[in-house]
């Protein structure tokens, strides 16, 4: 059946193949298989509502693996904190987490913005080798920009 959704997924699959982007290829392939076996009505709402949180959890686990393996410990932390690069990274991590917090709310509540952010993320992943954490950070940056615009237009 050639619905708009199926055609869009096939287009994204083609983009993923041309761009040789495994993440996008896997994601689109996964969604196509779910639709093909008829589980989309049950699984898509769950994935849509909880998927971002699952993704953040998986990324967090991956980042914590060096601590769990002992590759990073208190000694390495102490040595790193002597570097101004570490302090810059610490500040950037805090800023990104705070910006993304508002982005999550925006993604959940505004489908219009979500569409633009998702398309932007897909383009960045497929064409420029970006990483698909973009919607969350992008939404946070969009939220921040919207608040700044409100200040100057109110």
From Swiss-Prot:
The chain crosses the membrane at residues 14-34, 54-74, 87-107, 117-137. It is a multi-pass membrane protein. It is found in: Cell membrane. Keywords: Cell membrane, Membrane, Transmembrane, Transmembrane helix. InterPro entries: UPF0756_TM. One of its GO terms (cellular component) is plasma membrane. It holds the Pfam family DUF441. PANTHER family: UPF0756 MEMBRANE PROTEIN YEAL. Belongs to the UPF0756 family. This is UPF0756 membrane protein RBAM_026200. The lineage of its organism: Bacteria, Bacillati, Bacillota, Bacilli, Bacillales.
């Amino acid at each position: 059946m050639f619905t708009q959704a199926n055609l869009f997924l096939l287009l994204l699959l083609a983009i993923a193949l041309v761009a040789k982007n495994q993440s996008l290829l896997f994601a689109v392939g996964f969604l196509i298989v779910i639709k093909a076996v008829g589980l989309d009505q049950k699984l898509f709402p769950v994935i849509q509502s909880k998927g971002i949180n699952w993704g953040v959890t998986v990324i967090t686990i991956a980042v914590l693996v060096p601590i769990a393996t002992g590759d990073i410990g208190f000694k390495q932390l102490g040595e790193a904190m002597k570097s101004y690069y570490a302090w810059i990274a610490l500040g950037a991590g805090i800023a990104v987490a705070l910006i993304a917090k508002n982005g999550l709310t925006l993604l959940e509540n505004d489908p219009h913005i979500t569409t633009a952010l998702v398309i932007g993320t897909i383009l960045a992943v497929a064409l420029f080798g970006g990483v698909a954490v973009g919607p969350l950070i992008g939404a946070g940056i969009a939220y921040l920009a919207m608040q700044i615009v409100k200040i100057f237009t109110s």
